Design a protein with these regions (language model features):
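Active-site beta->alpha loop and helix N-cap motifs at the rims of alpha/beta catalytic domains
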Residues: 1-122
Length: 122
C-alpha cells in the first residue's frame, strides 16, 4: 500500500484569510499543523485571536515569530506570554521576517534564541 501525502500535511494561513472561513473544520482535519503567518502590517492582536481560534478548534498551531517585525526583546517576551497564556501555544516558527530593514533591535532568528526567553517560558 502506498501512503498518500495528503494523509499528513500542514498549511499556512494569515489571520485575514482565516477570518473569511466560517467552517474551517470542514476543510482541515483535526490536529492539522497550521502555521500562522505574521507578515508586515498584521496586528499582533489579530494574530493572537487567530491562534486562539485555531487552538480551540484542535489544530496544532505554530505562529511565526519574525524578528524584524519586533520592536525589542520586551515585545518578544509579550508575544511568548500572550500566545502561551491566551491561546495555549507551545511552539513557534522563528524567522528573520520579510522586511529588509529591522523595525527594532532584532534582525534574525538566532537573536530571538539568544534572548533566553524561549527557555525561560518552556
Amino acid at each position: 500500500m502506498t501512503a498518500s501525502i495528503l494523509e499528513g500535511f500542514s498549511i499556512e494561513v494569515m489571520p485575514r484569510t482565516l477570518a473569511k472561513i466560517d467552517n474551517l473544520e470542514a476543510l482541515l482535519p483535526p490536529s492539522t499543523r497550521v502555521y500562522l503567518a505574521h507578515i508586515e502590517g498584521v496586528d499582533f492582536q489579530d494574530m493572537l485571536a487567530a491562534a486562539a481560534r485555531l487552538t480551540k478548534a484542535g489544530y496544532q498551531v505554530m505562529p511565526h515569530f519574525p524578528a524584524r517585525l519586533m520592536k525589542d526583546v520586551s515585545t518578544l517576551e509579550n508575544w511568548i506570554q500572550s500566545y502561551a497564556g491566551e491561546a495555549g501555544i507551545s511552539e513557534a516558527l522563528l524567522l528573520a521576517g520579510s522586511p529588509r530593514a529591522p523595525q527594532g533591535t532584532l534582525s534574525n532568528s538566532m537573536q530571538l534564541l539568544e534572548t533566553g526567553l524561549f527557555d525561560k517560558y518552556h
